[in-house]
Amino acid sequence: MDERDERNQLMPLGEAKALAATEFARQLLETAVEYKELRMMYACAIKEVQTKFEVLETEFKVRYQRNPISSIQTRLKSSSSIIEKMIRKGIPFSMENLEAQIHDLAGIRVICYYVDDIYALADALTSQDDITLVEKKDYIKHPKPNGYRSLHLIVSVPVFFSRQKRQIKVEVQIRTIAMDFWASLEHQMKYKREIPDQQHIVAQLKSCAEDIARVDMEMMNIRRRLEESVDEPTEDDILIARLKKLDTPIL
């Protein structure tokens, strides 16, 4: 063991992480051109997946007269978040490791109205010929200990550039409006430095998550009952409905 290794072992963990972060940042700057090109590729992969969801949204409007998507959010992981994650996971810094081991550099979040919309959209996306499902984590059927619910997918999508084609991974999160509301508030509270009676707050948040999950299921069941209880349409009703379908906004 050399003198530098001994110093690293003896220094406090926080200081060691700070030094590692500084070293990672320096290495990132040294590969700035390559790194910027990599971020560009991941940004383009986000566009590819976002377009797929927008196409599905348009199809559902026309085919089923109901839009399952409330909103679509996208994000490219910040450089500081990448450094923090690689240090936390003990991943040595390199462009190769960044591509191979950080699966959520590109992210897209789809907010739905109902729980069954989540699975319908996930199936529609992953059944497409050019989409490869890399990983699936169902936190709806198997919530996290804190109560978090969402469907997480890691997909690989081909992106065509002027001189090459690249397979790029994108993290897709699909959740209901209610799940997103809970996750947003929980995220804010998690980053508060001083939380009095923290254990009680954590228990309350989990209880709220369970209440929200029950409401989600009730709202979905109400919608299904309403769809099933529609009166048998007359010939005039059918004619009017067909005319309305012709006027459905495409874009």
Positions of predicted regions on the chain:
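Gly/lys/ser-thr-rich phosphate-binding loops in alpha/beta enzymes
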Residues: 1-2, 160
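An acidic, glycine-/histidine-flanked metal-binding catalytic module
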Residues: 2-46, 53-59, 171-251
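Long beta-strand-rich cores associated with HINT superfamily self-processing modules
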Residues: 99, 112-221
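Terminal, regulation- and interaction-focused segments at domain boundaries
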Residues: 105-111
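Short, charged low-complexity intrinsically disordered segments located at boundaries
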Residues: 75-86, 112-117, 151-158, 220, ...
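Short, charge-rich amphipathic segments
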Residues: 43-61, 139, 143-151, 157, ...
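Active-site acidic/histidine clusters and adjacent loop/turn architecture
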Residues: 36-82, 87-97, 104
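Glycine-rich, low-complexity intrinsically disordered segments
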Residues: 15, 19, 69-72, 98-99, ...
